[in-house]
Amino acid sequence: AILASLMVLSLAACGGGGGDGKGSSGDMNVAMVTDSGDITDQSFNQTTYETAKKWSEANGVTFNYYKPEKDTDEARNAAIDQAVAAGANVILLPGYMFAASLVAQTNTYPDVKFIGLDVGEGDLCEKGVGEGYTYNPADYNVGDYYNTANTYCATYQEEISGFMAGYAAVKLGYRHLGFLGGMSVPAVMRFGYGYVQGADKAAADLGCTGDVTVEYVYGGQFFGDADITAAMDTWYSSRDVEVVFACGGGIYTSAAEAAAKVGGKVIGVDSDQSSKIDTYGEKMTVTSAMKGLDATVNMILTAIKDGKWSEYAGKIDSLGMVSDEPSENFVQLPRATTQWADGLFTDADYLQLVKDIHGGKITISNDITAMPSVSITVNDYGSIK
């Protein structure tokens, strides 16, 4: 377990690399490469793209994005090659899939600054070690596998925002919940296990643990399709699931399509997905379990502009809560669009929840070796594909 208020953990801190520059935006040329999605995914890629574009325009910096031709490491590396050839010297790489690119490309381009968003120590070790990897990054020195001098990576304490989403759902009166993850990768698992813990805590607070059930499954991919929609149809229509946390980029489409048929609800992920999900049904989105991609992008680009790259180079930060003020945190719920309800769960109740987590009154486990031990019922179906 972790103390959820422990916010920023850093690994393999190294300084220098690539130089801090002149502390001016004039020399910056920013690029972003998409992973397996596109900049319209209403999730990871879109948030990174829109934030980087807005920051670059405000700071007079050249910005371009590149979409790999295929969903392969080779295609992602080729897109990075293309960005560097076009003059990029700061490259944003959103998603764990870019671990292979960081291993392959950071030594090839020592004068380019690489920012891996949602790329953790385990991801880098897995790609760096290859065959024989033990899946325990503590067995390795992660810095042996990529150029720490020109790379900054950030992961997120998804278990916290997942917890808050599950807590809110039960407090808002939902008793039959679902979790539809993309793939069973660490970030998705942290979201899911946090969601289960949050639902359990709210049920315990309300004295209704015997009445709350979570159906739990992974889709095996980060997009919706007919097979996953059919599984969601079964949940909403046959099992009377009321709300599903769709946790995996574009996989929300299958949950939303199924929910629309019966007036069901959906919880979004990564960013505030309400504007996209609500196109399937008015007020379909209960809330979204967000992580601060925008805050991270703004933070690191500003640091580079201000000549403070050495404070970030070589770090792998685990970003979570830093304040009782939700907007300052890297994990949160969207206050403007969450469906608060008087007498059940209000914005004021959310502020208290944030305070309790940040202050350590509520602790949340980030352990993903097994489903959390809880008092509510959890039905784990593995993976659809």
Residue positions per predicted region:
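Sec-dependent N-terminal signal peptides
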Residues: A1-L6
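C-terminal motif of bacterial Sec signal peptides marking the signal peptidase cleavage site
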Residues: S10-A13
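Bacterial signal peptide processing site
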Residues: G15-G18
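A residue-level marker of the well-folded mature domains of exported/periplasmic proteins
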Residues: K22-K385
